[in-house]
């Protein structure tokens, strides 16, 4: 049986979707899955240089073995292709959530948005101009992955007696050199997944629900929220908020001098974001910071509602055209009103059904886990 070892370093929430999938495959006896403390990675072939590297943020380290080979895998769930980790040299396979074919196949800069000027992307251009020549000989290891999955955490109460038993079991397993137990985490993930499935049954109540921040080319986001205000004034049911965040050198927002008194930009009220999003005719999302997907975007795909987004620069391992979404580069977001007027309740339900089928085919946790296992062993 194929064995998968995950060497844990907290926090790794961005890769919980894969983690849940591996737990499910193990429960079905498709694989043997184990979790270990990070320092155990050297017993399975990883370099001890990783342990002294510093920040391992958004990186996970796995070994997949089939009885003959031990394949060292890094799962990179950073927002962008620009943040390829130099630790790739210590991996056999490198799964990259921020995959972009221009970067990793053509070894060139990505095709930026038409509304982005040279100053908007200068920081990334400079970074990539160094990383591509430095690591292009490692690009053969890079494989497409998925962006951040929906949040899988929730609070599940545990009795004092059970917690005591778990603590004893944990100490015993440590003393015997056994892998870490993850039973409680698996229960949390399963419970949360059931909650997510219920969101698919929400009825249409709103036109657009969007909770947003200025992080990531704020002028573009401001234009979106200005358009949402116009739509609200025309009678569309809009609930949205744009909060101001600290400016960044990455997207040149540090030079904009945005007035805090103009924020937050708010329309209506958002009480339960996930439920209201699931009840909205359209999910609309600007590109994430560093062009990455946000987990709320992936949640919208899971729920199945129609989605309008900036053209996607990050490429998952499946064809995004399997989903009914609209990609745009219109900085004035004029597409919104057209879609709101054209999509009927029948269309909405049909699109949801098709998108849910696509999600379950390409993005269900077990499917993602099988993809990682199979691609690792190719």
Each model region followed by its residue ranges:
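Nucleotide-sugar donor-binding catalytic core of glycosyltransferases
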Residues: 2-63, 67-291, 310-320, 365
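Catalytic binding pocket for nucleotide-activated donors in carbohydrate/polymer assembly enzymes
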Residues: 259-262, 270-377
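Short, Lys/Arg-enriched, disordered terminal segments
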Residues: 1, 377-378
């Amino acid at each position: 049986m194929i064995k998968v070892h995950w060497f844990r370093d907290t926090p790794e929430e961005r890769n919980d979707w894969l983690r849940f999938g591996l737990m499910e495959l193990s429960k079905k006896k498709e694989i043997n899955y184990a979790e270990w403390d990070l320092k155990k990675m050297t017993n399975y072939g990883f370099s001890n240089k990783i342990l002294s590297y510093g920040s391992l943020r958004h990186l996970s380290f796995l070994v997949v073995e089939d009885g003959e080979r031990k394949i060292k895998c890094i799962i990179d769930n950073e927002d962008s292709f620009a943040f390829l980790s130099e630790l790739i040299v210590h991996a056999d396979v490198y799964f990259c959530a921020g995959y972009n074919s221009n970067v990793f196949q053509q070894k060139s800069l990505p095709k930026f948005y038409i509304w982005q000027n040279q100053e908007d992307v200068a920081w990334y251009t400079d970074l990539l101009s160094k990383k591509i020549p430095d690591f292009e000989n490692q690009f053969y290891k890079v494989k497409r992955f998925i962006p951040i999955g929906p949040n899988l955490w929730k609070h599940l109460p545990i009795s004092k007696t059970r917690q005591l038993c778990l603590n004893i079991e944990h100490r015993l397993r440590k003393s015997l050199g056994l892998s870490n137990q993850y039973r409680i985490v698996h229960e949390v993930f399963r419970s949360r997944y059931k909650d997510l499935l219920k969101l698919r049954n929400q009825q249409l109540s709103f036109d657009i629900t969007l909770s947003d921040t200025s992080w990531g080319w704020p002028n573009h986001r401001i234009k979106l929220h200005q358009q949402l205000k116009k739509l609200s004034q025309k009678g569309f049911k809009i609930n949205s908020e744009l909060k101001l965040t600290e400016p960044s050198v990455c997207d040149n927002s540090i030079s904009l001098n945005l007035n805090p008194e103009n924020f937050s930009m708010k329309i209506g009220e958002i009480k339960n974001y996930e439920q209201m999003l699931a009840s909205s005719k359209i999910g609309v999302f600007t590109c994430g910071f560093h062009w990455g997907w946000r987990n709320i975007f992936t949640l919208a795909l899971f729920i199945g509602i129609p989605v309008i987004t900036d053209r996607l620069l990050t490429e998952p391992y499946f064809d995004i055209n399997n989903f009914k979404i609209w990609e745009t580069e219109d900085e004035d977001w004029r597409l919104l009103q057209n879609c709101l007027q054209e999509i009927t309740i029948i269309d909405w339900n049909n699109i949801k059904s098709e998108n849910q089928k696509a999600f379950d085919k390409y993005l269900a946790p077990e499917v993602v886990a099988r993809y990682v296992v199979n691609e690792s062993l190719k």
